[in-house]
Amino acid sequence: MARLRIELVKSIIGRKPNHIATVKSLGLKKMHDVVEHNETPELKGKLAQVSYLLKVEEVQA
């Protein structure tokens, strides 16, 4: 399974409530926060929903 590094690059202020909840469920609280997660189908769905707010990179293990 691949690891993904996810960074919040745009503000969640003024976004749809379900998009804000999705970003928070990823563990991102404020701009330029970075988290790493294993790539799963559930994660890919979340990333697709809020892709316009994020920068996603694959991490080499």
Swiss-Prot record:
GO biological process: translation
Classification via SUPFAM superfamilies: Ribosomal protein L30p/L7e
Pfam families: Ribosomal_L30
Keyword Ribosomal protein part of the UniProt annotation: yes
GO cellular component, as recorded: cytosolic large ribosomal subunit
Keywords recorded for this protein, A-Z: Ribonucleoprotein, Ribosomal protein
MF terms in GO: structural constituent of ribosome
Cited InterPro entries: Ribo_uL30_ferredoxin-like_sf, Ribosomal_uL30_bac-type, Ribosomal_uL30_ferredoxin-like
Cystine pairings recorded for this chain: none
The keyword Transcription regulation is annotated on this UniProt entry: no
Gene3D superfamilies for this protein: Ribosomal protein L30, ferredoxin-like fold domain
Known partners and oligomeric status: Part of the 50S ribosomal subunit.
Family: Belongs to the universal ribosomal protein uL30 family.
Protein name according to UniProt: Large ribosomal subunit protein uL30
Gene source species: Fusobacterium nucleatum subsp. nucleatum (strain ATCC 25586 / DSM 15643 / BCRC 10681 / CIP 101130 / JCM 8532 / KCTC 2640 / LMG 13131 / VPI 4355)
